[in-house]
């Protein structure tokens, strides 16, 4: 289906051409004065310069040609030369029925040429718990992935684990100090290693920070960790077996935590998976003359003549031969081109890493790791701050674990749901349902609270505001969906058959209903724009507008008590479409709605 605004533009453009003017002046936009009209065209103002006449003479001619067009209720020429447009309610009702018939798509066309897109998000380090700093990458990345999937593309989400380098040597060295008798440290051992890990996730989460602290104050410990890292990367059997245990224990816990966030990765690759590609990549860069030595390090120059600021070279290997994040990211691109051959790779990472990605992207292009046809995108996000405007911390100033934050919000929502239950005596929700509902609503509060902000901007994580059932919040959106579900349930309980409603939506009978239809009609344009700009906040803004439009219609209209049966069916059919579109949108944002609250 064509976007409503495009259909309107086509009609207005035809009128401009019929009146003797260039088609470029027929573009229509949403009205910036909704009190006067629904859409507007300012083309006559620009055309007046070319055709050397007063703009209102042009707008008068165009308006006269559109006077009898069935698409419009009215097209008014307003001095000095604007066209104010109102939609015909019958045309709008047909557009609604067409959207409803287009099951699961609602007028949004699928991509004609589906792309293969890799989304690199999450990026946790193994052996360390997820903290609040991991929230934005996970939440924004999951939504960007889901939006692209809804558009019809083949999308692969990769967690890109931090599982390489000194941190592994630190863990092995600390474990050796704690449990020196473990068979993994016996170099003469040739048998099979135990299948069960010699530590729990709790122990592992204590081992890493302890080891990290020691390495800063104890030089001999750091040297032992560096040696362990080298031996691990050199293939020492016992250390390889320990690495396998570290990965299994850590990834199991990470999956549990991401599951609680409703975040799912197609690939669980780590930096270690890219390491086999490093030697060949480095050799290629040397052979082809891309890489050269600078102050002992191997670098690739990536500055360009058009640069307005200094872009340092991309370091491939340090002076001691060690690789860096840039090395791993480039080798990961080599691996992805070989295994996935993506048309686009999207990275979700802190906006402060923008220089790193400029260097990596330029190096990848210059050295031919990726062809010109593959798009590389960095979505840089701002920080999540506390009410004091500083990065979000625990009450004692530490970094808050993500699961503790989610638990805090779950508890807050559970209290609100129980209070709501006391106020509504007929709402009998048992403890298990209340807890599940609280989790569902809390997740919406967290995700919507994040995603409703433009990704690049910092935002204040305000638990009180995010968990409110009023205003621009996740719980308000869910409350609206639950309200619609309740009306539909009552309709069916009285014998109504929702599945039999075909082309039932009739022309709007009041302003609230027309406003709801106009909001629904924006769905395809909104999702297309959110995809093109990788901007989930546009979907949040849309569903807030849609929820407000529905609630306005609900308060102005007797729905279930409507005596005219055809009109009641029209209302119910419109509610079904509203519910389905809201549900499709929140699914793209990565959360769902309960049946009642």
Swiss-Prot record:
Predominant location of this chain? cytoplasm
Q: Which Pfam families match?
A: Arg_tRNA_synt_N, DALR_1, tRNA-synt_1d
Instruction: Provide one Gene Ontology biological process annotation.
Output: arginyl-tRNA aminoacylation
InterPro entries given for it? aa-tRNA-synth_I_CS, Arg-tRNA-ligase, Arg-tRNA-synth_N, Arg-tRNA-synth_N_sf, ArgRS_core, DALR_anticod-bd, Rossmann-like_a/b/a_fold, tRNAsynth_Ia_anticodon-bd
- On the tree of life, the source organism's domain of life is Bacteria
Q: A Gene Ontology CC term for this entry?
A: cytoplasm
Cell inner membrane found in the keyword field? no
Q: Which NCBIfam families does the annotation name?
A: argS
What quaternary arrangement does the UniProt entry report?
Monomer.
Tell me which family the UniProt entry assigns to this protein.
Answer: Belongs to the class-I aminoacyl-tRNA synthetase family.
Q: Which protein, by its recorded name, is this?
A: Arginine--tRNA ligase
Source species: Agathobacter rectalis (strain ATCC 33656 / DSM 3377 / JCM 17463 / KCTC 5835 / VPI 0990) (Eubacterium rectale)
């Amino acid at each position: 289906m064509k976007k409503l605004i495009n259909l309107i533009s086509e009609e207005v453009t035809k009128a401009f051409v019929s009146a003797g003017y260039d088609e470029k002046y027929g573009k229509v936009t949403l009205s910036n004065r909704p009190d006067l009209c629904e859409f507007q065209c300012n083309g006559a103002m620009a055309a007046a310069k070319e055709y050397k006449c007063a703009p209102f003479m042009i707008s008068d001619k165009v308006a006269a040609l559109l006077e009898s067009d069935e698409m419009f209720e009215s097209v008014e020429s307003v001095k000095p030369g604007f066209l104010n447009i109102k939609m015909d309610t019958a045309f709008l009702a047909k557009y609604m029925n067409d959207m409803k018939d287009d099951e699961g798509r609602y007028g949004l066309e699928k991509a004609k040429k589906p792309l293969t897109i890799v989304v690199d998000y999450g990026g946790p380090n193994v052996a360390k718990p997820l903290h609040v700093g991991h929230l934005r990458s996970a939440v924004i990345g999951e939504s960007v992935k889901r939006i692209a999937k809804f558009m019809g593309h083949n999308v692969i989400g990769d967690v890109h684990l931090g599982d390489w380098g000194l941190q592994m040597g630190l863990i092995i060295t600390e474990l050796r100090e704690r449990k020196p008798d473990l068979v993994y440290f016996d170099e003469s051992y040739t048998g099979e290693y135990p299948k069960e890990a010699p530590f729990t996730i709790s122990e592992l989460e204590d081992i890493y920070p302890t080891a990290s602290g020691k390495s800063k104050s104890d030089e001999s410990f750091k040297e032992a960790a560096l040696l362990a890292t080298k031996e691990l990367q050199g293939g020492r059997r016992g250390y390889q077996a320990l690495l396998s245990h570290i990965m299994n224990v850590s990834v199991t816990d990470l999956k549990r935590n991401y599951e609680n966030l409703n975040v799912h990765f197609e690939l669980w690759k780590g930096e270690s998976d890219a390491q086999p590609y490093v030697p060949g990549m480095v050799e290629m860069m040397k052979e082809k003359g891309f890489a050269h030595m600078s102050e002992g390090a191997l670098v690739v120059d990536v500055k360009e003549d058009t640069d307005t600021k200094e872009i340092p070279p991309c370091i491939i290997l340090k002076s001691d031969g060690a690789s860096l994040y840039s090395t791993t990211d480039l080798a990961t691109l080599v691996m992805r081109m070989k295994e996935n051959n993506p048309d686009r790779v999207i990275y979700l990472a802190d906006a402060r890493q923008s220089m790193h990605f400029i260097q990596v992207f330029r190096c990848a292009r210059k050295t031919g790791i990726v062809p010109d046809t593959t798009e590389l995108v960095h979505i840089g996000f701002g920080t999540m701050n506390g009410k004091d405007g500083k990065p979000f911390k625990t009450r004692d100033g530490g970094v808050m674990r993500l699961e503790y934050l989610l638990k805090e919000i779950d508890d807050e929502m559970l209290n609100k749901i129980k209070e709501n239950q006391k106020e509504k005596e007929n709402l009998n929700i048992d403890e298990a349902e209340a807890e599940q509902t609280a989790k569902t609503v809390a997740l919406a509060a967290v995700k919507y609270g994040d995603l409703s902000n433009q990704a690049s901007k910092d935002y204040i994580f305000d638990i009180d505001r995010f968990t409110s059932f009023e205003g621009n919040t996740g719980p308000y959106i869910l409350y609206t969906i639950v309200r619609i579900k309740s009306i539909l349930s009552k309709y069916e309980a009285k014998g109504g058959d929702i599945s039999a409603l075909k082309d039932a939506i009739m022309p709007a009978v009041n302003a609230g209903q027309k406003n709801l239809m106009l909001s629904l009609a924006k769905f395809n344009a909104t999702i297309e724009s959110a995809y093109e700009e990788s901007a989930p906040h546009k979907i949040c803004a849309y569903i807030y507008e849609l929820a407000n439009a529905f609630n306005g219609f609900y308060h102005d209209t007797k729905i279930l008590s409507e005596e005219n049966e055809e009109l009641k069916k029209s209302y119910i059919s419109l509610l079904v479409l509203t519910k389905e579109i809201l549900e499709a949108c929140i699914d793209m944002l990565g959360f769902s709605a309960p049946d009642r609250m």
